[in-house]
């Protein structure tokens, strides 16, 4: 595929910035079998980008993905995915570093094995591993975490399953620079109950809720727990119109500061509309909001306190509270045209607003930039 874009307001700590971005992404995909039955798929893609006004060309980005499914047509089913990526790009949100290109490796693996113990019940085990490692010298914590779940389902009807599951996981934190403090291994425990399946002729999805505990055994007072949720439903308003709603609530550790817990709440709503009767035109639109509540954490450090009656700040060394609330609002919309199976054209717009509110006035608008970003992307995709 070939992608060209225009982006404004990328870095609010500097004057308004706009740039023309070009991306060429060759790739290849191999598949054995059909996704409706048993299959194995391998994909590779290389993204080559250029920021023309900034005169910056990030290192070529490489993406590999493997996905598969096996069903013995009796009682056993297995499915899983794995992706490995080398990415070199600017980063936004609560890991944004302003005008800095950041190289990083990521690995993400998910798998599930299900055994039908009867016509109405099944047992399953699932697992995941998430890994991210930033280049040396970046003041962000990477992590290497895995989680395993054991669950069971019961079908009161042919289309609906009620489930209960419990899980346990570990997260090791990776320091990209010695300036970052050491964080011991974090343990996470949780349990969910819920329902999934085809609720009506038009409504399907998963609705689950439970409780999650993130524990730092070697750090007194650093453990915390929250009610957790995982909701994902879709509604087919018409054959040509589909709405999707998702909400998740989960725990994590802050990427910038050792021992600081964070709770993320993410909500998204998307709509997909096929235009006309030929199926070659499609429009999409979406809105999402992610809030991050970072726990109170006091430490001795630098603060830039406002000077009353002026716009100036004074540097002081004192006890500061790193408690903060972040929010990310994203809007998107686009239209695509697919005159052939091997040819697709697209025009897309995206808006992103990131804001941060520190409890301590000496930290506000200093360490993390807030920003608005507008992106207009035009692309063509060629291939089978």
Show the residue positions of the predicted features.
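Gram-negative and organellar
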Residues: 1-384
């Amino acid at each position: 595929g070939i992608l060209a874009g225009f982006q404004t307001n990328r870095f609010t700590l500097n004057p308004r910035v706009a740039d023309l971005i070009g991306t060429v992404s060759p790739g290849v995909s191999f598949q054995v079998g059909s996704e409706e039955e048993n299959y194995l798929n391998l994909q590779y893609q290389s993204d080559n980008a250029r920021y023309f006004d900034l005169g910056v060309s990030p290192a070529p980005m490489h993406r590999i993905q493997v996905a598969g499914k096996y069903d013995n047509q009796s009682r056993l089913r297995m499915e899983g995915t794995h992706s490995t990526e080398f990415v070199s790009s600017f980063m936004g949100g609560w890991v944004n570093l302003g005008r800095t290109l950041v190289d990083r490796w990521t690995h993400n693996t998910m798998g599930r094995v299900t055994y039908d113990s009867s016509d109405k019940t099944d047992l399953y085990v699932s697992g995941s591993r998430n890994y991210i490692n930033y280049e040396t010298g970046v003041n962000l914590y990477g992590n290497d975490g895995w989680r395993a779940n054991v669950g069971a389902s019961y079908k009161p009807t042919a289309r609906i399953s009620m489930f209960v599951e419990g899980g346990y996981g570990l997260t090791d934190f990776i320091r990209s620079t010695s300036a970052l403090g050491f964080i011991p291994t974090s343990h996470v425990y949780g349990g969910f109950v819920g329902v999934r399946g085809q609720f009506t002729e038009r409504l399907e999805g998963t609705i689950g809720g439970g409780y999650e505990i993130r524990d730092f055994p070697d750090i007194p007072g650093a453990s915390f727990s929250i009610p957790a949720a995982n909701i994902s439903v879709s509604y087919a308003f018409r054959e040509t119109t589909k709405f999707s709603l998702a909400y998740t609530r989960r725990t994590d550790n802050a990427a910038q500061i050792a021992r600081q817990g964070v709770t993320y709440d993410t909500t998204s709503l998307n709509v997909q509309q096929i235009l006309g009767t030929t199926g070659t035109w499609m429009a999409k639109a979406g809105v999402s909001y992610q809030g991050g509540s970072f726990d109170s954490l006091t430490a001795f450090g630098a603060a830039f306190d406002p000077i009353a009656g002026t716009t100036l700040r004074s540097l002081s060394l004192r006890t500061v509270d790193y408690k903060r609330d972040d929010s990310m609002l994203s809007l998107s919309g686009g239209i695509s045209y697919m005159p052939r199976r091997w040819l697709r054209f697209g025009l897309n717009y995206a808006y992103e607003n990131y804001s941060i509110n520190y409890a301590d006035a000496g930290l506000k608008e200093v360490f993390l930039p807030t920003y608005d970003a507008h992106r207009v992307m035009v692309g063509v995709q060629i291939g089978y």
